[in-house]
Every structure is written in C-alpha cells, then in structure tokens.
C-alpha cells in the first residue's frame, strides 16, 4: 500500500519510526518549520527530522485548503492511503478523496470520547482511569469518522502527558500495522461512532494552566500531570510565577482550619506538603520564574520556606 504520512510532533514521529520498516511510506507531510525556545531558533518538526534521516520526501505546505499546487502534488504521488497522526491542520475533503482508501487517522482516545486536539491532556486532567487509541476513517468532521479499531490501556498514577503520549504512540503504531492489511484486503469495515457519547478535547487555555488551590486535591494532582513535561502547572509564590511539574496526593482530614495552598510540612523524603481541600499535595519538581527546573530539596534549600507560607491563585 502506497502511503503518504501526515504528522508533526513527537507522538507522530514515534508512530512513523515504528511503521516505516513495514510499510511503503512514499512521502511525509508535516507543519512548516517554526521558531522555538528562548532564542527563537527555526526548528523543524520531529517527523521531518526522522523523514530526512530515512530519505523520505517531505512536504510542508503553509495551507491546505484551496492549495491547488499541493493538491496536484498529492495526486501525482498516486497514494493508496493517507495515514494521519497529530498533523495539526484539518485536511480538506478533496485531498482525503484522492487515495482509494482515503484518510486513516490515529487518534489518541477511545472515540467518541475526547474528539479534538488535546485528548491526552484532557483524559489525564479529568482523572480518567483508562484511555486508548482509535484508528478511524477520516471525513469532514473533527474526529467524527467511523472507527476501524480501538485499543485501551490504563492511565497509571505516575503517568503524565509525556509518558502517556509515548505509550499511546507505540500502541497506535501496533494497531495500524494490524489493521492496514485488513483494510486493504477488504476484511475490516469501520463502525460509525455513537454520537450521543461524544465528548470534546479542545486545546488547554492559559487559564487552565493556573492551579486553583480550592479544588479537590485529586483534581490539582491530575492537572499537574496533564501539563507535564510542558508547559507546567502554574501558581504564584512570593509574588512570582512558580511552575509545578510533579506532585503526589495524600488524602487526609484536617481538624483545624487551614487555608488551602498553605505549606504545612517540609519533608526531605516526601516533598513540600501543601494543604488542599481534602488532603496534602506533596510538591516534588518545581521551576521558579527565571530559573531552571529543580527538585523539591533544591527549592527548599534555595528559598528557605516557612511553614504557613502560601501558594496563591494569582
């Protein structure tokens, strides 16, 4: 099967690396190079990096809709299928209709739950116990197409967005390699999604990065994991931004009235203990404004914390 692969971030690169030895990837389409980091250096996507290393032709159109030149390029390549994994742009119907098997998408959720751009982050932030990948036939709607196959995995307590993304990428690659031959041989038909069960996973807003210390402890813990390894969950300490990348939650009932967000313990083994609605959030990895990431021990030593100090919502 002649395949054009559409993808951009590390999630997509892992899938491409896993499937490329077994499939005929004739070209890769990825997002244009963009400035990144503090120095705003122009960087190419992980997918482009890998494709170049393997000698796979790369295309980086600025736009797809109404791009006649790109349409003709895709048509001239004579693909049998487009395989898409976190490309980052909506692929117009006229392009999806070029190959006989259409567009086949790897989506990092158990559809119809968590349609949209941020299924991994949303699943963790909502404290879900499991998630998975879906292989679906693409159509005009956002992740609304019929589904060929689904595979589930548990979300473990130590999973964050980064670790879960890697697991789901490998799972998606395995599932793709199983279903593509069945699709080609006409042995697997996609099943329509149950619309009444659909939920959506839009990108997280800047406001959702800020910790509300009045939320339940589990929710804050899930928020921190959903925002790690980047951009990090945000709070304010001594008038400056502080990002938190790793924490543990311990359920506990307090007899006395303590304001949520208050430092109640400094434990060299467990972390910085912060009072939350229904327990203690143990902070483990932090990044003060303008500084590098550090362990809780480095933070405790550098900032000489006081019991009773508070992390603020703003």
UniProtKB/Swiss-Prot annotation:
UniProt KW Transferase keyword: yes
Entry EC no(s): 2.1.2.9
UniProt GO MF annotations: methionyl-tRNA formyltransferase activity
GO cellular component, one term: cytosol
Coiled coil residues, start to end: none
Family annotation (HAMAP family): Formyl_trans (MF_00182)
Top-level class of the enzyme under EC nomenclature: transferase
Gene Ontology BP terms: conversion of methionyl-tRNA to N-formyl-methionyl-tRNA
Residues annotated to bind (6S)-5,6,7,8-tetrahydrofolate: 109-112
InterPro entries on file: Fmt, Formyl_trans_C, Formyl_transf_N, Formyl_transf_N_sf, Formyl_transferase-like_C_sf, Met-tRNA-FMT_C, Met-tRNA-FMT_N
Catalytic reaction list: L-methionyl-tRNA(fMet) + (6R)-10-formyltetrahydrofolate = N-formyl-L-methionyl-tRNA(fMet) + (6S)-5,6,7,8-tetrahydrofolate + H(+)
Protein name per UniProt: Methionyl-tRNA formyltransferase
Keyword entries, A-Z: Protein biosynthesis, Transferase
Role: Attaches a formyl group to the free amino group of methionyl-tRNA(fMet). The formyl group appears to play a dual role in the initiator identity of N-formylmethionyl-tRNA by promoting its recognition by IF2 and preventing the misappropriation of this tRNA by the elongation apparatus.
Similarity comment: family membership: Belongs to the Fmt family.
Natural source organism: Dictyoglomus turgidum (strain DSM 6724 / Z-1310)
